[in-house]
C-alpha cells in the first residue's frame, strides 16, 4: 500500500503538468471531454482545506481563453498587481464549478508560454526596473490608448477561424464568448467601458526577449515613441552606459536609436486638455526632437531623475569634450535614423495594424505611388525632365540666383540649427542686405520662412553647456533668436558676418565664450577675425555683397563720369577693328538688341576693366614718383662722390656717412620700385584678359577722345586684340554707324559711302 501511494504521489504531479500543457493546445471535442473527466477526478483527490495544497490544477480555459493561467502563477511571486487580484477573485467566485485549482509546488520551474499566437497588437510593458528587482513585463492590447490608461480595446472581425474553447463539455467560439470568458474581443459600448475597471494582463517574457538588454540598464520600459508623421510606435526604451537606447522589439540585438544623454536637453510636458499623453521631449544636437510618452507623472519624474544622475557626472568633469568628440557621428546617425523612420512609417505601418485601422492608413500608403512612378520611368524621360527643370531654374529671381551661385564665393550662406518653440530645427540661412533669411532648404530659395533685420542687434555667444557652439541675436537685450553651428569654425564665421552686418561697435576680440576649452576658443576667435575682416573689407562693403551681374543696364552709362574712368564701347562695323586704349576716356556700351543676351558677360567685363584700369593708373603714378625720387637720389649720390674726392679729415668722414645713408635709401627705393613693377605687370595681364573677354562676348575697346577724332592723333599703346566678326546675321542686325573708327582710310571711306546711299 505504501508503494502504491508513493507511485500515486509521483503520478499526480506528472498528470498535473500534462493537463497544463494540454490546456494551451488546440484540442478536439473528444479530447476536451477526456480532459474534463480527468479534471473531475483530480478535484475528488483535492485535499482538505487545512492540508498542504501540493497538487492543484486550474482549468485555464475558463479564464481569458488560457491566459489567466499565467496570471495565477504571479500569486506565488512578490508582485503588486493592484486591480488584477480583485478581478481574479471575481472570476474565481463566478466560476468555482468550472475550474479546479492546483498551483505548482514552489520548486517547480516556470511554466512554458502558451503556444497560441497572441493578437497582432499585443505589446509588452516593462515595469520600471529598480535595484534588486527582477524585470516584470505587462502585456496590453490597445495600442491607440494613452500610455497611462491601457484599455482592452482590441477588436477583430468576426469569422470562423477563432480557436474553440470548451467549458464543461460545451463548445464556444471566441467571438461568441461572454465578456468575462474571453479576452480576444471587448465590447465597444461606451457606457460599459466607462463602468469597467482598467485591466492589465501579465505574461512571462519569452526566451527571445533578450533580457541581457536590460540587465545593466539604469531604467527600462516600453514607451511610445512619436514618429515623424504623428504615429506612435511602442519601443523598448532603456538608459544604459549614459545613453538612451530604443529597440523596436525586445528580440532585437542592436538598438534602433542610440543617443548620448550628455548632448540632449530633456523636458517634461504633462498631460492636459490638448495633449493626451505625458511626454518626455529630448532636444537632439542636430535640431530634431525625440518625443517619448510615459504612463504617468510619477514615471516621468523617475525617468528625469535617472537622466539627471546620468548627465551630472559627465557635465561636471568636462562639459565640452563629449560635444566635440561625438558631434559629427551623432548627426550622421540621427539623419540615418530619421530616414529609416520615415520609411517604416510609409511602408511597414500597414502590416502591423489590425483590419479596423486599414481605412485610416490608406491615405498614408498612397505616397508609394510616386515612388513607383519614378521607378518605372525610363532613363530618357528622366533626363528630359531634368533638362526641363534645369532650364526653368535659369529664369529664377535675381535673389535666388545670387544666393545659389555664390555659395562658394561669398561665405554668407549655410546650415544653422534654429531654436523654434523649444525645438531645434535645421534651416538654410542667408545674409543679404543686413537681413538674415531662413529657408527650409537650400533648394527652395524663392520663399523664406522668416527674416530678421540685423540693424541695431547684438550677437552674444553661448547657450548652455549642452550647446557649446550656439549663439544668440539680441535686440535691446531681448532675445530675437538662438542659432547653433556645427563646429567651432562655422560658429566663428557666422559671428564675424553677423558682427559686420549688425553694425555693432563690439569688436571680435571682445566676445566672451563659455562652455568651451582654450583650444576651441582660439579656433573660434581666429575664424571670427577672418570673417569680420572679409565682411568689412572694401570688396564686400562697396559692392554690398552684390556680383557684377546684379548691376542694372541703365546704370552702366554715366555721362558725368570723371576722365580716366574705363568705358568700353560696342563696335559696329562690317569687319574687324583694332582694339586699343587711348589716353582719354574709354567707354563700355551695350548693343541695344543684344543687351539681355550678353548682360552677364558684359557687366563682368565692364567691372573688371574699370577696376584694373584704375589700379593700373594708380600703380603707374606710384612708379613715376619712385622713379623721379630715385633719379634725384642718384644725382645727389654722384655729387657727393665728386665732393668726397676733394675733402679730407673730419669733413670726409661726414661725407662718407651721408653717402652710406643715401646708398641705403636708394636700395630701399629700388626694392619698392621692383615690387611696383611686379604688381603692374600682374595688373596689365589681368586687364588684357578682361579686355580679351569683352570682344568674345560682344564688346570692343575703342578709343574716343572728348573732341572729334583727328587724323594726326596717335594712340599711346599698340593694338591689343582684333575683334572677329564670325556671324553674318550678327552683322546684319547691327546698325551701320554706331561708332566711328579713329583711324583708317578704308573704313572712313566706307562710312562716307554708306551715308551717300539713298
Curated annotation (Swiss-Prot):
Annotated Gene Ontology cellular component terms: anchoring junction; cell projection; cytoplasm; podosome; stress fiber
Pro residues biased stretches: 102-120
PH domain span: 216-312, 409-503
InterPro entries in alphabetical order: AFAP, PH-like_dom_sf, PH_domain
Job description of the protein: May be involved in podosome and invadosome formation.
SUPFAM superfamilies for the chain: PH domain-like
Compositional bias annotation for Basic and acidic residues: 749-758
Residue ranges the record marks as coiled coil: 602-690
Disordered: annotated segments: 91-194, 335-369, 692-758
Pfam families for the chain: PH
Protein keywords: Cell junction, Cell projection, Coiled coil, Cytoplasm, Cytoskeleton, Repeat
The protein's name: Actin filament-associated protein 1-like 1
Keyword Cell membrane listed: no
Amino acid at each position: 500500500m505504501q508503494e502504491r501511494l508513493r507511485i500515486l504521489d509521483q503520478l499526480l504531479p506528472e498528470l498535473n503538468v500534462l493537463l497544463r500543457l494540454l490546456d494551451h493546445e488546440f484540442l478536439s471535442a473528444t479530447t476536451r471531454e477526456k480532459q474534463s473527466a480527468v479534471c473531475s477526478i483530480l478535484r475528488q483527490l483535492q485535499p482538505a482545506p487545512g492540508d498542504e495544497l501540493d497538487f492543484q490544477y486550474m482549468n485555464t480555459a475558463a479564464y481569458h481563453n488560457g491566459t489567466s493561467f499565467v496570471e495565477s502563477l504571479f500569486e506565488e511571486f512578490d508582485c503588486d498587481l493592484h486591480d488584477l487580484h480583485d478581478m481574479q477573485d471575481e472570476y474565481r467566485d463566478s466560476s468555482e464549478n468550472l475550474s479546479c485549482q492546483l498551483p505548482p509546488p514552489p520548486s517547480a520551474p516556470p511554466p512554458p508560454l502558451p503556444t497560441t499566437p497572441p493578437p497582432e497588437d499585443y505589446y509588452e510593458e516593462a515595469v520600471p526596473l529598480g535595484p534588486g528587482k527582477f524585470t516584470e513585463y505587462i502585456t496590453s492590447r490597445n495600442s491607440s490608448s494613452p500610455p497611462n490608461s491601457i484599455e482592452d480595446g482590441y477588436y477583430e472581425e468576426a469569422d470562423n477561424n477563432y480557436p474553440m474553447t470548451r467549458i464543461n463539455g460545451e463548445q464556444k467560439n471566441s467571438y461568441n464568448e461572454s465578456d468575462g470568458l474571453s479576452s480576444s474581443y471587448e465590447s465597444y459600448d461606451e457606457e460599459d467601458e466607462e463602468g469597467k475597471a482598467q485591466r492589465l494582463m501579465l505574461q512571462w517574457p519569452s526566451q527571445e526577449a533578450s533580457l541581457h538588454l536590460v540587465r545593466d540598464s539604469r531604467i527600462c520600459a516600453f514607451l511610445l515613441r512619436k514618429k515623424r508623421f504623428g504615429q506612435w510606435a511602442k519601443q523598448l526604451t532603456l538608459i544604459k552606459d549614459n545613453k538612451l537606447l530604443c529597440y523596436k522589439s525586445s528580440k532585437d540585438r542592436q538598438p534602433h536609436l542610440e543617443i548620448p544623454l550628455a548632448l540632449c536637453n530633456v523636458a517634461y510636458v504633462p498631460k492636459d486638455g490638448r495633449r493626451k499623453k505625458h511626454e518626455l521631449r529630448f532636444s537632439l544636437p542636430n535640431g530634431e526632437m525625440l518625443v517619448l510618452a510615459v504612463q504617468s507623472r510619477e514615471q516621468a519624474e523617475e525617468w528625469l531623475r535617472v537622466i539627471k544622475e546620468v548627465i551630472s557626472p559627465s557635465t561636471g568633469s568636462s562639459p565640452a569634450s563629449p560635444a566635440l568628440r561625438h558631434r559629427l557621428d551623432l548627426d550622421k546617425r540621427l539623419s540615418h535614423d530619421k530616414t529609416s523612420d520615415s520609411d517604416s512609417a510609409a511602408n511597414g505601418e500597414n502590416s502591423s495594424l489590425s483590419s479596423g485601422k486599414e481605412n485610416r492608413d490608406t491615405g498614408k500608403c498612397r505616397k508609394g505611388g510616386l515612388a513607383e512612378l519614378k521607378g518605372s520611368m525610363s532613363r530618357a524621360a528622366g533626363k528630359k525632365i531634368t533638362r526641363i527643370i534645369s532650364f526653368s531654374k535659369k529664369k529664377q529671381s535675381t535673389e535666388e540666383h545670387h544666393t545659389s551661385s555664390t555659395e562658394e564665393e561669398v561665405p554668407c550662406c549655410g546650415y544653422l540649427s534654429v531654436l523654434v518653440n523649444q525645438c531645434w530645427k535645421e534651416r538654410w540661412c542667408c545674409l543679404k542686405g543686413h537681413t538674415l533669411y531662413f529657408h527650409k532648404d537650400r533648394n527652395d530659395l524663392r520663399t523664406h520662412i522668416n527674416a530678421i533685420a540685423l540693424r541695431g542687434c547684438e550677437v552674444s555667444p553661448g547657450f548652455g553647456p549642452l550647446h557649446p557652439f550656439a549663439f544668440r541675436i539680441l535686440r535691446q537685450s531681448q532675445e530675437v533668436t538662438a542659432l547653433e553651428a556645427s563646429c567651432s569654425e562655422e560658429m566663428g564665421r557666422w559671428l564675424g558676418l553677423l558682427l559686420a552686418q549688425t553694425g555693432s561697435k563690439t569688436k571680435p576680440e571682445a566676445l566672451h565664450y563659455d562652455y568651451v576649452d582654450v583650444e576651441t576658443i582660439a579656433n573660434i576667435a581666429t575664424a571670427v577675425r577672418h570673417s569680420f575682416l572679409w565682411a568689412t573689407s572694401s570688396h564686400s562693403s562697396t559692392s554690398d555683397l552684390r556680383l557684377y551681374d546684379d548691376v542694372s543696364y541703365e546704370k552702366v552709362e554715366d555721362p558725368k563720369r570723371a576722365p580716366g574712368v574705363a568705358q568700353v564701347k560696342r563696335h559696329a562695323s562690317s569687319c574687324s577693328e583694332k582694339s586699343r586704349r587711348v589716353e582719354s576716356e574709354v567707354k563700355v556700351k551695350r548693343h541695344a538688341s543684344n543687351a539681355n543676351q550678353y548682360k552677364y558677360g558684359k557687366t563682368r567685363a565692364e567691372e573688371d576693366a574699370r577696376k584694373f584700369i584704375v589700379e593700373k593708373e594708380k600703380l603707374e603714378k606710384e612708379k613715376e614718383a619712385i622713379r623721379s625720387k630715385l633719379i634725384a637720389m642718384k644725382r645727389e649720390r654722384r655729387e657727393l662722390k665728386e665732393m668726397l674726392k676733394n675733402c679730407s679729415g673730419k669733413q670726409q668722414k661726414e661725407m662718407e656717412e651721408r653717402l652710406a645713408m643715401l646708398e641705403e635709401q636708394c636700395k630701399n627705393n629700388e626694392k619698392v620700385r621692383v615690387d611696383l613693377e611686379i604688381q603692374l605687370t600682374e595688373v596689365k595681364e589681368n586687364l588684357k584678359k578682361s579686355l580679351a573677354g569683352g570682344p568674345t562676348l560682344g564688346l570692343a575697346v575703342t578709343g574716343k577722345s572728348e573732341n572729334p577724332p583727328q587724323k594726326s592723333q596717335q594712340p599711346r599703346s599698340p593694338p591689343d586684340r582684333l575683334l572677329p566678326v564670325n556671324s553674318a546675321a550678327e552683322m546684319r542686325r547691327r546698325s551701320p554707324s554706331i561708332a566711328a573708327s579713329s583711324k583708317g582710310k578704308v573704313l572712313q571711306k566706307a562710312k562716307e559711302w554708306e551715308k551717300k546711299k539713298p
